[in-house]
């Protein structure tokens, strides 16, 4: 049987890595030949989950067409967030929980997008629908994905379905979701050894908002000041990225996982749109965004509206 590659977005987060592994596991148990792969480096939070549940990181790839004809996308659909040669392969399936944008195919496909907080929540349903048992290690990775995307169930993206799925998966994995989850998030929030280049690319996504080209990066921390004291370095590197990619705006969202607030650092010609979107005033290119923790639900929609005005 012809091999299929399954992958999430560039600059992978925990949901992207763990959902690729989980969906490949399900597809293989259903008789397919699927391999999970990744499009970037594994972050500290994800590595914690992989190590805890004794799972290998997926293989790193830059292109797919040199290996396979068909691919499956998890945790994303927008072309600019996907593999470099996405136009040269057939997208067979998409399993996602984000907005649909900049996406079209030449062939029909299986497309499943649900308004839940995490791709792994959808996959939990799919295991059940196919009467396939979830192994302990896979359950642990799927739980990790939900905890990551929902910030331990505190994010506004978190739904009752995510909470219910996490409860089921924690039982299979044999862990206490709260205790394990906090340790995992803290592992991801240790930014002390990260370069500024790493900080702005750990979890960065590019969007087309109206006619504007925008990159939004997010980092989690237990102390915003730890990141803010590197502001001069961050601004220098971000300005370089803005010039290289011809961006209208680069927004770095520094999220305090304990206080559930974020600090925005905005660089680019359209930085004023951040003020409009959040009804804040940028001082020295930064503003506190009270209660904002979700890029998907609290940042992208309001910025999209602001860019359209």
Curated annotation (Swiss-Prot):
Gene3D superfamilies: DHHA2 domain (3.10.310.20), inorganic pyrophosphatase (n-terminal core) (3.90.1640.10). It is an enzyme of class 3 (hydrolase). The keyword Hydrolase applies. The keyword Hydrolase applies. Pfam families: DHH, DHHA2. This is Manganese-dependent inorganic pyrophosphatase. PANTHER family: BNIP - RELATED, MANGANESE-DEPENDENT INORGANIC PYROPHOSPHATASE-RELATED. It catalyses: diphosphate + H2O = 2 phosphate + H(+). Homodimer. Mn(2+) 2 binds at residues 15, 75, 97, 149. Mn(2+) 1 binds at residues 9, 13, 75. Belongs to the PPase class C family. Binds 2 manganese ions per subunit. Its cofactor is Mn(2+). Keywords: Cytoplasm, Hydrolase, Manganese, Metal-binding.
